[in-house]
Amino acid sequence: MVVSTPQNIALADAKKGIAMFQQDNINVPVLGIVENMAYFTPEELPENKYYLFGREGAKNLAADKEVPFLGEVPIVQSIREAGDVGRPAALQNKTAVSDAFEGVTRNTVSELIKRNDHLPPTQAVKITTMAGCSAVKK
């Protein structure tokens, strides 16, 4: 799974990550892409969406790279507040946040099932060279 925000610089990094995973010598399947901080929704206007960092950047990248789009997570104050008290925001009941996390979870499980039904187990990435690495000093 690759997670990106909608900003161009973040999308460029996500694109590089996908390309790395898809290299023949690495060959790690990408389950899909999630767009974090997709839009801002103020608590007092829960129906309003403000696309502060761009719109559907990760969704467009998923289409371009032919990998599934798993969903988007908004910026809302309750995510920060839940994190501050150690309670996962995904455990909120009947909120836009819980709906977003539930959608990402459902899509991820669906893609995992497809991956397991159609692809062999992923092999461990083997390190074949130490070029560019420093020796470890003990």
Indicate residue ranges for each PLM-predicted region.
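C-terminal boundary of histidine-terminating zinc-finger modules
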Residues: 83-98
